[in-house]
Regions:
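Terminal low-complexity/charged segments
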Residues: 1-189
């Protein structure tokens, strides 16, 4: 039988030794210290053997997506999240932790959950996070010579260097067509 999310969050928090948990929007979420990230996954491995996903968020000045900063001293950080589940009971829990942006690294959970392998590789490639102990942090998407981490908020988009956002609408003709008129038909009189 599936526990309700708030009971599940409280139970999992007790198992991993955390006092920070919630069940917002029907999802059990437990915060763990980054030093205990691997240990939390090892502890939950038997109870929650299904690894669903891992992701990272670049929190710059927002407290939450779209929220204005509460003060000028908002801590810039990366949040790492993973979702574990039990397919027999239907339970899912999201574990999350914060890591510093100046040296973004955290223990790899790929040795506990094989499914975390590619998720960690993607986060390493796109966000520049070092998953310590990962067996193969090679690129998945980008060429090996690519410089930078495209999902970081500090990553400069070339298209925005060439044409500032939001830019103007360029009306270009299709090949073998005349350029569309930019005159107002009412002014043509």
């Amino acid at each position: 039988m599936t526990a309700n999310p708030s009971e599940l969050a409280e139970r999992v928090a007790g198992v991993v030794g955390s006092d920070r948990f919630s069940s917002d929007n029907g999802t059990a979420k437990v915060r763990v210290d980054s030093d205990h990230w691997l240990e939390a996954h090892q502890t939950l491995g038997a109870e929650m053997p299904y690894f669903s996903w891992l992701s990272a968020i670049d929190w710059a000045t927002e407290v939450a997506v779209g929220d204005p900063p509460e003060s000028e001293d908002v801590e810039s950080r990366y949040e790492i999240l993973s979702c574990l589940g039990n397919v027999e009971t239907g339970e899912l829990v999201v574990l999350s932790t914060d890591i510093a942006k100046d040296e973004p690294s955290i223990a790899s959970v790929a040795g506990v959950f094989g499914g975390a392998n590619w998720h960690e590789r993607e986060a390493a490639e796109m966000m520049g996070i070092d998953f310590v102990g990962h067996p193969n942090l090679t690129h998945l998407y980008l060429p090996d010579a690519f410089e930078g981490h495209p999902l970081r908020k500090t990553f400069a988009l070339l298209s925005r260097d060439v044409k500032p956002w939001p830019g103007t609408v360029d009306v270009e003709p299709m090949p073998d067509e005349e350029a569309p008129s930019t005159e107002n038909p009412e002014d043509a009189g």
